[in-house]
């Protein structure tokens, strides 16, 4: 009996034929995969089978999209991503048209018979699973509950999309993130005791957010507006809609991330610094100039007034774009900005390659603590480590 492929167990070692996606004339089939959590896994399978993957839609390329994407189904030009999985599972190249989205459901087609079986003259039909519809097992349920318990940042996380997309990407199960979310909300939420699991915990940062939400009910997430989402939106629109609906939560998480990044080692709490995203166009003052022109407490308080709404909106827009570009969550992108002094170019390079473009290291909590010390030797060590310009930028960033 054909079982669902477990792509998570051995993603680097597919066993299907290396010519699976090579035509009879020796040319490789070309595929374009719409951005999704499954894109990397699909690309691995395609490349191992001798196919090629396009960065953009090219003439002659097979356009792949996940079932349920409204734009893809409306155009009629896309083939279900299930085509790749079924080809690999059977280790044979199947009929493309049987998986075309729009005119006929790929899921329904997959449930009738594998297209390709007739082409090969197979006389013995196999029991087939519904494409994209795999029954949930007890192991799947435990995996879902455990993942929520360990990764849910707040009660509202389970009604959003980011948590479930991350779980799908982790390949703990073979279900889509929409199915995982639906399974938890309709069947598993509140049933942890049946699986000998405790209630889903909330991280310390989330507990702070929850307390603030209780004090300010208008800023709290009710969860009800998220029911307005439709599963037909492509992933890019999911991310935009989720952040628009939770704008207040995004602002609070930025503040929380800042506080977590900077460990206070004195009794009195210094004022938190906001995230200011800069393009690094103007030259900041040198550390020497900065030490000679320290603003008094009243000036600092004036500078630390609330950021204007347009500035908040611009910051959220930039962070959202980086989340989509690198397929990362809000916390990861925010921490990257904090470690790179809010510099957009440096943060983008760090997210792409794991290091700054100028070759200098990123800032740590200990570095920030050292930066506050009135010690010439310590300051010189920081200048040697990060460069005078980066030290000056860090000082300016912390002032904001």
Swiss-Prot record:
Residues 105-126, 196-244, 264-311 are annotated as: Disordered. GO terms for cellular component: chromosome, telomeric region; cytoplasm; nucleus; shelterin complex. GO terms for molecular function: telomeric DNA binding. Residues 280-305 have a biased composition (Acidic residues). Residues 78-101 form the BRCT domain. Keywords: Acetylation, Activator, Chromosome, Cytoplasm, Isopeptide bond, Nucleus, Phosphoprotein, Telomere, Transcription, Transcription regulation, Ubl conjugation. The keyword Phosphoprotein applies. One of its GO terms (biological process) is negative regulation of DNA recombination at telomere. The modification N-acetylalanine is found at residue 2. It is found in: Nucleus; Cytoplasm; Chromosome; Chromosome, Telomere. Residues 128-188 form the Myb-like domain. Pfam families: BRCT_2, Myb_Rap1, Rap1_C. Its main location: nucleus. Residues 112-125 have a biased composition (Low complexity). It comes from the Eukaryota. There is a cross-link at residues 114, 194, 208, 212, 240, 373 (Glycyl lysine isopeptide (Lys-Gly) (interchain with G-Cter in SUMO2)). InterPro entries: BRCT_dom (IPR001357), BRCT_dom_sf (IPR036420), Homeodomain-like_sf (IPR009057), Rap1_C (IPR021661), Rap1_C_sf (IPR038104), TE2IP/Rap1 (IPR039595), TERF2IP_Myb (IPR015010). The modification Phosphoserine is found at residues 36, 43, 154, 156, 203, 206. A motif (Nuclear localization signal) lies at residues 384-400. Belongs to the RAP1 family. Acts both as a regulator of telomere function and as a transcription regulator. Involved in the regulation of telomere length and protection as a component of the shelterin complex (telosome). In contrast to other components of the shelterin complex, it is dispensible for telomere capping and does not participate in the protection of telomeres against non-homologous end-joining (NHEJ)-mediated repair. Instead, it is required to negatively regulate telomere recombination and is essential for repressing homology-directed repair (HDR), which can affect telomere length. Associates with the I-kappa-B-kinase (IKK) core complex, composed of CHUK, IKBKB and IKBKG. Homodimer. Component of the shelterin complex (telosome) composed of TERF1, TERF2, TINF2, TERF2IP ACD and POT1. Interacts with TERF2 (but not TERF1) with its C-terminus. Interacts with SLX4/BTBD12. Interacts with TERF2; the interaction is direct. This is Telomeric repeat-binding factor 2-interacting protein 1. It comes from Macaca fascicularis.
């Amino acid at each position: 009996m054909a079982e669902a492929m477990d792509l998570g167990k051995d993603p680097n070692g597919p066993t299907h034929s290396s010519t699976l996606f090579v035509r009879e004339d020796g040319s490789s089939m070309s595929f374009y995969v719409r951005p999704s959590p499954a894109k990397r896994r699909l690309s691995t399978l395609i490349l191992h089978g001798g196919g090629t993957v396009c960065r953009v839609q090219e003439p002659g390329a097979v356009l792949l999209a996940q079932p349920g994407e409204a734009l893809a189904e409306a155009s009629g030009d896309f083939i279900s991503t299930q085509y790749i999985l079924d080809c690999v599972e059977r280790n044979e190249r199947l009929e493309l048209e049987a998986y075309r989205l729009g005119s006929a459901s790929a899921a329904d087609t997959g449930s009738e018979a594998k297209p390709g079986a007739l082409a090969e003259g197979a006389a013995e039909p196999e029991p087939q699973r519904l494409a994209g519809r795999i029954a949930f097992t007890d192991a799947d349920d435990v995996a879902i509950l455990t993942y929520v318990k360990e990764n849910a940042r707040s009660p509202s996380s389970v009604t959003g999309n980011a948590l479930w997309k991350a779980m799908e990407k982790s390949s703990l199960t073979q279900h889509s993130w929409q199915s995982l979310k639906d399974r938890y909300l309709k069947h598993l939420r509140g049933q942890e005791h049946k699986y000998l699991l405790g209630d889903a915990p909330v991280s310390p940062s989330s507990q702070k957010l929850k307390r603030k939400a209780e004090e300010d009910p208008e800023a709290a997430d009710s969860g009800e507006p998220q029911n307005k989402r439709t599963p037909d939106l492509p992933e890019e629109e999911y991310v935009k809609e989720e952040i628009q609906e939770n704008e207040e939560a995004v602002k609070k998480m930025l503040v929380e991330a800042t506080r977590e990044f900077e460990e206070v080692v004195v009794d009195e709490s210094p004022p938190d610094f906001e995230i200011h995203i800069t393009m690094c166009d103007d030259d900041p003052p040198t550390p020497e100039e900065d030490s000679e022109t320290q603003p008094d407490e009243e000036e600092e308080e004036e500078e630390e007034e609330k950021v204007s709404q347009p500035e908040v909106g611009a910051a959220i827009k930039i962070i959202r774009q980086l989340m989509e570009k690198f397929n990362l969550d809000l916390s990861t992108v925010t921490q990257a900005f904090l470690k790179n002094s809010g510099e957009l170019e440096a943060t983008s390079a760090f997210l792409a390659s794991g290091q700054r473009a100028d070759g200098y290291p990123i800032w740590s909590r200990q570095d920030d603590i050292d930066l506050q010390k009135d010690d010439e030797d310590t300051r010189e060590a920081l200048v040697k480590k990060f460069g005078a310009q980066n030290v000056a930028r860090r000082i300016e960033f912390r002032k904001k």
